[in-house]
């Protein structure tokens, strides 16, 4: 089979990775994508590392069963827990992960604190703490674990009073006037960007890693000579692990902007 015409696999613990897929479609409009959301087991951020590894390997096997030419782990928690093991196990296929976009936040050189919102597991993992240590001397960073936020997005709640109350409560431990930027360290969180901006104001820059990951994916495809050069719009197939998944597929398409 012509590798250039093979699809690209995307995986997340639920609907969050669609925020990355949304960017990837813009960067790679000719490619076909297969998206697998493991909403049945969401959220990953409060599970053990071993549990997340097992679920991530199962998801990658599912995608490989669909003859994908590359896999994007569009989940910060799964990247933290499993990316090294995945790359060691699947050496013949590019596996791209995602990490909190600390570098762009630091390079803004804005006065004030950089707040990193993520799941408890992402913030506890060595991979993230090594990344924090790398930039610690250049900016003041505050880690903000957000258990429960993924669940809002999984239900399709991306704005409104209930979500606003949750965010206000989480951010109440930090003086908002001292925040220069917010790094969204979970792929579910870009969907609540609008609500977050309402609370923090327009001067606070909100950054996520979706574009960086999509550009990295394109680089890997070029390197592997597997970029689809056909002049046609690609397709997207969405799968989800929930038993009755009609509603979550509908939410997924809505978040992706295809309905």
Curated annotation (Swiss-Prot):
PROSITE patterns per the UniProt record, alphabetical: ASP_GLU_RACEMASE_1, ASP_GLU_RACEMASE_2
User: What pathway is it annotated to?
Assistant: Cell wall biogenesis; peptidoglycan biosynthesis
Query: Which reaction does this enzyme catalyse, per its entry?
Result: L-glutamate = D-glutamate
* InterPro entries in alphabetical order: Asp/Glu/hydantoin_racemase, Asp/Glu_race, Asp/Glu_racemase_AS_1, Asp/Glu_racemase_AS_2, Glu_race
Q: Which GO terms describe its biological process?
A: cell wall organization; peptidoglycan biosynthetic process; regulation of cell shape
Which residue positions are annotated as catalytic?
Answer: 75, 186
What GO terms are given for molecular function?
A: glutamate racemase activity
Q: Could you say which EC number(s) this protein's record lists? A: 5.1.1.3
Q: What does this protein do?
A: Provides the (R)-glutamate required for cell wall biosynthesis.
| PANTHER family assigned | GLUTAMATE RACEMASE (PTHR21198:SF3)
Name of the protein this chain belongs to: Glutamate racemase
Question: Which organism encodes this protein?
Answer: Clostridium novyi (strain NT)
């Amino acid at each position: 089979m012509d590798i250039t015409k093979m699809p690209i696999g995307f995986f997340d613990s639920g609907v969050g990775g669609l925020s990355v897929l949304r960017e990837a479609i813009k960067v790679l409009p000719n490619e076909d994508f297969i998206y697998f959301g493991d909403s049945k087991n969401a959220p990953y951020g409060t599970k053990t590392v071993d549990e997340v590894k097992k679920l991530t390997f199962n998801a990658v096997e599912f995608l490989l069963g669909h003859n994908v030419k590359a896999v994007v782990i569009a989940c910060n928690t799964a990247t933290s827990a499993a990316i090294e093991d995945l790359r060691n196990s699947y050496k013949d296929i590019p596996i791209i992960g995602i990490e909190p976009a600390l570098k762009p936040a630091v390079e803004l050189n804005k006065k004030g604190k950089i707040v990193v919102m993520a799941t408890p597991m992402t913030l506890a993992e060595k991979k993230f703490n090594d990344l924090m240590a790398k930039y610690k001397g250049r900016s003041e960073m505050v880690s903000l674990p957000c258990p429960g936020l993924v669940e809002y997005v999984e239900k399709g709640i991306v704005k409104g009073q209930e979500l606003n109350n949750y965010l206000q409560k989480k951010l109440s431990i930090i003086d908002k006037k001292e925040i220069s930027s917010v790094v969204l360290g979970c792929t579910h969180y870009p969907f609540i960007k609008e609500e977050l901006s309402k609370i923090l104001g327009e001067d606070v820059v909100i950054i996520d890693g979706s574009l960086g990951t999509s550009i990295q994916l394109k680089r890997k495809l070029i390197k592997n000579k597997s970029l689809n050069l056909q002049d046609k719009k690609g397709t997207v197939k969405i799968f989800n692990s929930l038993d009755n998944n009609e509603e979550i597929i509908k939410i997924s398409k809505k978040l992706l902007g295809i309905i």
